[in-house]
Amino acid sequence: MYKLLNRTDFINMENIREDLEYYIKKYNFDGIELIKFNESDNTSVKEYIKGYHMRFFPSWFELYTGNISALYEELKDKKYFKSLCGGEESKEELIDYYKKELEIAKELEVEYVVFHACNSKVTESLTYNFKYSDKEILDGVISLINDVFDNEKYNFKLLFENLWWPGLKLLNKEEVEYLFSKIKYKNIGLMLDTGHMINSNYHLKSSKEAVEYIKRNIDNLGEYKNYIYGMHLNYSLSGGYVRKSIEENRDKKIDIEDLMKRIYIHINSIDYHDPFEDEGIVDIIKSLPIKYLVYELIAKSDEELEDKILRQDRVLKKFKIF
């Protein structure tokens, strides 16, 4: 099992090797899972990059299906399309973006790539009144991934990650079975995000309840739990915040300009990526064929990140996971 740390390419390229070597050596990581937001060339540190997280455009579905009028109806202004949808005019922009990402992943010689198999309109993140069903989004994911991979052959695994919005939630085997049966690329598996799974039930009130909930869902996957090759290990318990957001916004006219100014604060309040410190997580890790255990933590400073790494290490080292 690899112990990995998630990192973005926001770091200055002159300092990226120093940054990666610091965390890898000090905390005994085997490497990183990279998510890219800029055009920097990361091949100089590719020996440290085990996985590549494909960019997530949360509202991609209507761009992909050509429902541009629905995007204007919600977002009012085209200036938001690219960051939320992956393009401004047509699905070809989104497909081309992801094709380029696969070429980057190939150049970096990563072992796996991760894709968020879900969609949410930005206002739905406040109200939880979702326009599209899980099945509709999964059908979109299948079509998009088949377009992007386009019968190309790569050496890396494609891991589908669960979220709490419409799409893949990993709550039952039927959704996984359906997804896997339609994807043409066959070197596939699952990336279980523990925080995302907790987020899918905003009635959970404690880490103990969260652990039991994750265990039940894994049991519900049946034989498909054997495809969980990766785990994004983190913890969020934000049900109280979510319930309040739903109550305050479901019957309210939402100002999109105001929402876009605070959307990242809102999402981080739901999915805040703390360490998973309940020792019950250890049995879950041991029950799965995980090869890539990723500390996926969010921090506002290096000091906060190191504190979170230490807190996560404390739990896993106690039970000799590493």
Question: What is each residue range found by the language model?
Answer:
Residues 17-24, 40-43, 102, 145-149, ...:
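Short amphipathic alpha-helical segments and helix-helix/interface helices
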Residues 1-9, 30-34, 48-54, 113-115, ...:
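Hydrophobic faces of well-ordered beta-strands that scaffold small-molecule active sites
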Residues 23-27, 32-34, 126-138, 144-145, ...:
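Residues lining hydrophobic/aromatic ligand-binding pockets adjacent to catalytic sites
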Residues 10-16, 29-45, 57-62, 92, ...:
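Acidic-and-aromatic substrate-binding clefts and catalytic sites of carbohydrate-active enzymes
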Residues 87-189:
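Active-site acidic/histidine proton-transfer and metal-coordination neighborhood
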Residues 61-72, 131-132, 247-253:
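Aromatic- and acidic-residue-enriched segments that line the glycan-binding/catalytic groove
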Residues 1-100, 318-322:
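N-terminal pre-domain/capping segments
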Residues 1-2, 22, 95, 99-100, ...:
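Histidine-acidic metal/acid-base catalytic patches
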